[in-house]
Amino acid sequence: MNPIVSAASVVASGLSVGLAAIGPGIGQGTAAAQAVEGIARQPEAEGRIRGTLLLSLAFMESLTIYGLVVALALLFANPFTA
């Protein structure tokens, strides 16, 4: 295996996990803050708000998992090596 391709794969996998975690992390923080604010304003709607929050958090977390899958593919099943 070419050492340059190997080093680039490690760097790319690190970047894919790091960059894939930034957006969902910010989004999850914002969504949780807005959910807490919504529950504080309307306590009777807590069940609907919490259900919607958990579903949206799962969708946001899936983006981070996709970044992890790309990183693992680059590390262990690299298509750029012969």
Swiss-Prot record:
Q: Which GO molecular function terms does the record list?
A: lipid binding; proton-transporting ATP synthase activity, rotational mechanism
Out of the domains of life, which is the source?
Eukaryota
Which keywords has UniProt assigned to this entry? ATP synthesis, CF(0), Chloroplast, Hydrogen ion transport, Ion transport, Lipid-binding, Membrane, Plastid, Thylakoid, Transmembrane, Transmembrane helix, Transport
Ranges that cross the membrane: 7-27, 57-77
Q: Where is this site: Reversibly protonated during proton transport?
A: E61
**Pfam families hit by this protein:** ATP-synt_C
The record describes its membrane topology as:
Multi-pass membrane protein
Alphabetized InterPro entries for the sequence: ATP_synth_csu_bac/chlpt, ATP_synth_F0_csu, ATP_synth_F0_csu_DDCD_BS, ATP_synth_F0_csu_sf, ATPase_proteolipid_c-like_dom, F/V-ATP_Csub_sf
Entry GO CC:
chloroplast thylakoid membrane; proton-transporting ATP synthase complex; proton-transporting two-sector ATPase complex, proton-transporting domain
Any idea where this protein resides? Plastid, Chloroplast thylakoid membrane
Q: Please give the HAMAP family that the UniProt record associates with this protein.
A: ATP_synth_c_bact (MF_01396)
State whether it acts alone or in a complex, and with which partners, per the record.
Answer: F-type ATPases have 2 components, F(1) - the catalytic core - and F(0) - the membrane proton channel. F(1) has five subunits: alpha(3), beta(3), gamma(1), delta(1), epsilon(1). F(0) has four main subunits: a(1), b(1), b'(1) and c(10-14). The alpha and beta chains form an alternating ring which encloses part of the gamma chain. F(1) is attached to F(0) by a central stalk formed by the gamma and epsilon chains, while a peripheral stalk is formed by the delta, b and b' chains.
Q: What protein family is recorded?
A: Belongs to the ATPase C chain family.
Q: What does this protein do?
A: F(1)F(0) ATP synthase produces ATP from ADP in the presence of a proton or sodium gradient. F-type ATPases consist of two structural domains, F(1) containing the extramembraneous catalytic core and F(0) containing the membrane proton channel, linked together by a central stalk and a peripheral stalk. During catalysis, ATP synthesis in the catalytic domain of F(1) is coupled via a rotary mechanism of the central stalk subunits to proton translocation.
Q: Which PANTHER family match?
A: ATP SYNTHASE LIPID-BINDING PROTEIN, MITOCHONDRIAL, ATPASE PROTEIN 9
Q: What else is known?
A: In plastids the F-type ATPase is also known as CF(1)CF(0).
Name of this protein: ATP synthase subunit c, chloroplastic
Q: Which organism is it from?
A: Rhodomonas salina (Cryptomonas salina)
The uppermost taxa in this organism's lineage are: Eukaryota, Cryptophyceae, Pyrenomonadales, Pyrenomonadaceae, Rhodomonas
